[in-house]
C-alpha cells in the first residue's frame, strides 16, 4: 500500500449510506472520506453533504474547494455545508497540495471530482446536469479556473460546471504582489512565495504558465456564471484581482455579479452574514435549480 493511501470506502457501503440518508434521516447528512481519485497512488477524498429531498428528486450540487495557499487546508472545514439545508448536495474536496504535486495537478483534481460526481449521481441522488463550484482564497482561484479554462474536447464525462462563487481568489498570478519583487520583497522572497511553489517557478521565469493558471487570462464568452465576493480591506489578495476578473467577464458577455464587502478583510464574518448567504443562495438557485 502506498504511504499516501487512506482506506477506500467500499461502494456497497456508499450505496447503503445513500439509502439510509433517504429513508432514516430527516436532516442533511454527511458521508465522509469518499475516495474520488488516486493519481499516482495518492488517495484523494471528499465529504458529501446530502440534503433531505423528496423521494425521486435529484439535488443540484456545489463543489467546495478550500483555501490555504495551495499548500495548507483540508476539506474538513466546509464553508458551504449550510447549502445542504437549502436542497443542495455539497462535495467538499481535498486536492493535491504543493508539497505533493505542482500545477496543473490541483485543477486536474478539481475537474476529476466533478467527473466523479457525475459518474455517481445516480447512487447519491445528484443532479448531474446542475453542478457549480465555490471556493475561498486559493480555492477561489481554482473554482474561477474551473469556470473559465477550456474543457477537454475528448472528455468521456464532462467536468463542465454552470456557476462559480469566488471568494477573494487570486485571478492574475502575474500581478499578485507576493509573486513580484518590490515593496520590501526580495528575489528570495518571490522564489519562496506560494505562487512559485504552485507553478514550480516564479511568474517572471514562466509567464505563460502563470497565464494558464490565471482565470483573468482564460475568460471566454462560454464561461460559467460568476458571483465574486471580496473585502475592500483584504491584506492578502488585492481587491483589484476580483474587480478586473468581473470586468473582463462582463465584457465577454458572461453573467457576473460583484459584491464588495465594506470593511472586510481576507475572509471573516462579513462573508457569512444572513445577507451574504442569501446572495449566494439566490445565485446558485438562479443557475443550478430547475425551474
Name every feature range the model reports, one short phrase each:
Residues 26-57:
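N-terminal cap/lid segment of alpha/beta-hydrolase-fold proteins
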Residues 39, 177-218, 251:
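Mobile cap/lid helix-loop segments that gate and shape the active-site cleft of serine hydrolases
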Residues 57-67:
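Short beta-strand element of the alpha/beta-hydrolase
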Residues 112-182:
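Primarily recognizes the serine-hydrolase "nucleophile elbow" in alpha/beta-hydrolase
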Residues 173, 233-237:
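Acidic catalytic loop of the alpha/beta-hydrolase fold
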Residues 222, 228-230, 234:
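Short beta-strand/loop motif that positions the catalytic acidic residue
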Residues 264-273:
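Catalytic histidine-centered segment of alpha/beta-hydrolase-like enzymes
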Amino acid at each position: 500500500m502506498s504511504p499516501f493511501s487512506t482506506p477506500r470506502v467500499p461502494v456497497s457501503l456508499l450505496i447503503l449510506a445513500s439509502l439510509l440518508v433517504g429513508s432514516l434521516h430527516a436532516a442533511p447528512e454527511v458521508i465522509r472520506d469518499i475516495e474520488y481519485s488516486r493519481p499516482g497512488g495518492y488517495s484523494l477524498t471528499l465529504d458529501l453533504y446530502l440534503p433531505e429531498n423528496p423521494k425521486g428528486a435529484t439535488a443540484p450540487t456545489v463543489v467546495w474547494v478550500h483555501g490555504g495557499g495551495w499548500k495548507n487546508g483540508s476539506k474538513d472545514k466546509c464553508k458551504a455545508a449550510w447549502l445542504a439545508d437549502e436542497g443542495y448536495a455539497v462535495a467538499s474536496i481535498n486536492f493535491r497540495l504543493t508539497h505533493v504535486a505542482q500545477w496543473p495537478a490541483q485543477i486536474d483534481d478539481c475537474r476529476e471530482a466533478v467527473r466523479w460526481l457525475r459518474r455517481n449521481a445516480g447512487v447519491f441522488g445528484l443532479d448531474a446536469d446542475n453542478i457549480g463550484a465555490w471556493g475561498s482564497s486559493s480555492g477561489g482561484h481554482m473554482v474561477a479556473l474551473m469556470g473559465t479554462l477550456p474543457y477537454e474536447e475528448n472528455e468521456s464525462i464532462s467536468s463542465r460546471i454552470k456557476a462559480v462563487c469566488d471568494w477573494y481568489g487570486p485571478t492574475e498570478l502575474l500581478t499578485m504582489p507576493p509573486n513580484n519583487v518590490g515593496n520590501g520583497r526580495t528575489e528570495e522572497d518571490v522564489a519562496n512565495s506560494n505562487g512559485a511553489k504552485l507553478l514550480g517557478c516564479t511568474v517572471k521565469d514562466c509567464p505563460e504558465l502563470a497565464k494558464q493558471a490565471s482565470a483573468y487570462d482564460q475568460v471566454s464568452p462560454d464561461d460559467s456564471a460568476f458571483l465574486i465576493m471580496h473585502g475592500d480591506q483584504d491584506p492578502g489578495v488585492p481587491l483589484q484581482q476580483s474587480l478586473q476578473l468581473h470586468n473582463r467577464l462582463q465584457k465577454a458577455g458572461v453573467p457576473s455579479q460583484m459584491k464588495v464587502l465594506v470593511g472586510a478583510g481576507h475572509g471573516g464574518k462579513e462573508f457569512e452574514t444572513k445577507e451574504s448567504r442569501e446572495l449566494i443562495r439566490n445565485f446558485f438557485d438562479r443557475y443550478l435549480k430547475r425551474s
